[in-house]
Amino acid sequence: MNDKIALITGASRGLGAALAESLSASHHVIAVARTIGALEELDDRIIASGGQASLAPMDITNPEAMAQLCRSLYDRWGKIDLWVHAAVHAAPLSPASTIDRKDFAKSLAVNVTATATLIPFIAPLLGEDGTAVFFDDPEAKGKFFGAYGATKAAQLALAQSWQAEALKVGPAIKIVTPKPMSTATRARFYPGENRSGLNDPKGEANRLLAEILDPTPSLTRR
């Protein structure tokens, strides 16, 4: 069994699932997502490749469930080495003047409130030497991206604040930028797009892995 533990929130599809598979070669993966079937399919792929995973079919917007998960992780392993936060809600594109209130509320809950809840739960598990990873999305700007863009920017503001605060004491906070990928999230934004020129999530996960596992923090500690 791998000694290192990687917690991946948003692990059922897209980049989160691809990173779970890639990381399973060197880490025991804790895969968190709401979709049980997709998690089970991920587990099958990880087992087939010789890795190991623990599945946590949970909603990250449920703070009680997340607190229980983190207690369970501490009770079993005492710590984690890596947290990859890939969970995101991509609200439909809409003019700012007609944003649906329910879509915006869900975007806030998943992209902002859950992140703000998870950071203090997970920081003690990471300690000084762990690493947390967040994802930038430069395309989440401009017209019609109001709901997603605003909440994604708020999520990154939380990550950047934590990154600066932890610079001297740890953990290492990394904000990485994936290339455009052929994912369900992107398809919601660009339903008629020719996807042949987009990157495959597995290939992009492998590209990002070197940056994620690089022991050098994103900002040099002083």
Residue ranges and their predicted role:
Residues 26-41:
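Conserved glycine-rich Rossmann-like NAD(P)H-binding loop of the short-chain dehydrogenase/reductase
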Residues 9, 80-88, 111, 134, ...:
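Rossmann-fold scaffold of SDR-type NAD(P)-dependent oxidoreductases
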Residues 67, 88-105:
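Conserved mid-core segment of classical short-chain dehydrogenase/reductases
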